[in-house]
Amino acid sequence: MLMTAAADVTRRSPRRVFRDRREAGRVLAELLAAYRDQPDVIVLGLARGGLPVAWEVAAALHAPLDAFVVRKLGAPGHDEFAVGALASGGRVVVNDDVVRGLRITPQQLRDIAEREGRELLRRESAYRGERPPTDITGKTVIVVDDGLATGASMFAAVQALRDAQPAQIVIAVPAAPESTCREFAGLVDDVVCATMPTPFLAVGESFWDFRQVTDEEVRRLLATPTAGPSLRRPAASTAADVLRRVAIDAPGGVPTHEVLAELVGDARIVLIGESSHGTHEFYQARAAMTQWLIEEKGFGAVAAEADWPDAYRVNRYVRGLGEDTNADEALSGFERFPAWMWRNTVVRDFVEWLRTRNQRYESGALRQAGFYGLDLYSLHRSIQEVISYLDKVDPRAAARARARYACFDHACADDGQAYGFAAAFGAGPSCEREAVEQLVDVQRNALAYARQDGLLAEDELFYAQQNAQTVRDAEVYYRAMFSGRVTSWNLRDQHMAQTLGSLLTHLDRHLDAPPARIVVWAHNSHVGDARATEVWADGQLTLGQIVRERYGDESRSIGFSTYTGTVTAASEWGGIAQRKAVRPALHGSVEELFHQTADSFLVSARLSRDAEAPLDVVRLGRAIGVVYLPATERQSHYLHVRPADQFDAMIHIDQTRALEPLEVTSRWIAGENPETYPTGL
């Protein structure tokens, strides 16, 4: 089954973020931009591994660089296991608990310290020659390493540096456990941890290239100046200059048909994202591109990040079936928060267009284009839809389904989260067996049900089968919600991928012409490839990644971005829809780079090789979901991404406006008061 297989692949695969130490240093430098051009800043790299990282930081900040030598004190017979550290100046830090636990004698500890002390002096002489260490008294010292594990070496460095009485001590590393970063936050003036992988296995797991740094490389880096007017490098503007030459005009976020045709090619699956769930231009441009793909390229379905039964009600409407008389009614099934995500003016107009377009074809025929959902939040609604279907075709099977699904009645009605909590913590039964049995029962009788009424019956059977699959996957998902964020996220995206695959198979079965082609509508966080983002280090996967692995060149992904404007979002989960001001993008972000490039454009390394270099750099990328928290924007809405690998193309619209819900509240109309933003005072 896809879920198990994908989970196994995730555990076996390396979870890298940075190409090498130099790239990690460039990422850190962007996060340390506040220290740029400050005359009292000195960058110290912990030798040897921290020097390539530190050189990039120092060069970007236009600050002097020096090496600080720290030697790990390894346990007897196990040199790689640190029991402490020795820093320049003779400062020794020892983990007393480890020393006692390993029964290391004082004499053994002295022998280890003396041996490492000799190596420390040798390295200082090799790196610096006769030159004395840089005077850091009264200075702001940024201490850089290639990562932290236990933090013993960094702790020894901090203790030794304090003796020199610097004005401030700042620690900056590309990767470290969250617990270690928090520990140092209480010891120094500032801590910058670019990534905090969970679980944290080793520093080297965050790098594709983690080869050992040599003494010669350290000497070469120290001999290469990092400060001085002639050395200042406008890296971001240079990247923007390159992008200006290759950016393709896309008014309103919509490229020309020729550009879109070249980008899509013969792909069967085109995933079109959004960097927020509440931006009008993202929805409008996506709808316009989808209309052209349906009309001119034979795409036969939209598969959205929406619940299966609610989306299928829309599918019936656009095919001229069901009882709804207009698009507003067809979308009324979307009642769960956030309703505006699909109950909005853009989706309403698209649904009405799709119904009008489909009327040119025979009602119910698969030459019509459909509208489907990929998500799994519809636990109880899907249960009701399975039973409703079986009541019509097999009353005895419906009775069996009622008996099995009664297991879910122990939790609050329509509350999958309450079921998950009860099952996870033993406060209620797990309904896993019942959900699986019912899915098997529906699948076992599928052929008999399909023969009862031809093609239309087979469509409804497929609908029922997917509802049963959704119940089974939602049951697992809601239990997993209370065991970890990554686990539940992966289950959700694996379910989306499974549903997409089943939909392709279903549509293929009835096409005489070329294979079925589907447009996917979902957030960038699902559409993009997780392997090109820092969440990959946590073991997280995405729909876009799974689709690429399964379908290769038969798939394309398009991401959206914006620099500023307004967005429809809530301030908390389940909250009211608000029209909120979007802050200008952070320094060092993809959005800032695009802001420096043009107003509305498409850029793709597939269409222009020159676009690859500026996009093949780790930068911050913004992701606004249904909740937007400007006060904690860096922590809540940004992650490190490599755009060249995350998407096949990106479309940037510099200033955007909030998506209009069908049910507009007075608070949404009022928006935010710019005079009091963001303090609210």
Curated annotation (Swiss-Prot):
Q: Which GO terms describe its biological process?
A: response to antibiotic
Report whether Manganese shows up as a keyword of the record: no
**Pfam families the UniProt entry points to:** Erythro_esteras, Pribosyltran
Q: Which UniProt keywords apply?
A: Transferase
GO CC annotation: cytosol; peptidoglycan-based cell wall; plasma membrane
Question: Which signals induce this protein?
Answer: A member of the dormancy regulon. Induced in response to reduced oxygen tension (hypoxia), low levels of nitric oxide (NO) and carbon monoxide (CO). It is hoped that this regulon will give insight into the latent, or dormant phase of infection.
Membership in a protein family = In the N-terminal section; belongs to the purine/pyrimidine phosphoribosyltransferase family.
Q: What is this protein called?
A: Uncharacterized protein Rv2030c
Native species of this protein? Mycobacterium tuberculosis (strain ATCC 25618 / H37Rv)
Organism lineage: Bacteria, Bacillati, Actinomycetota, Actinomycetes, Mycobacteriales
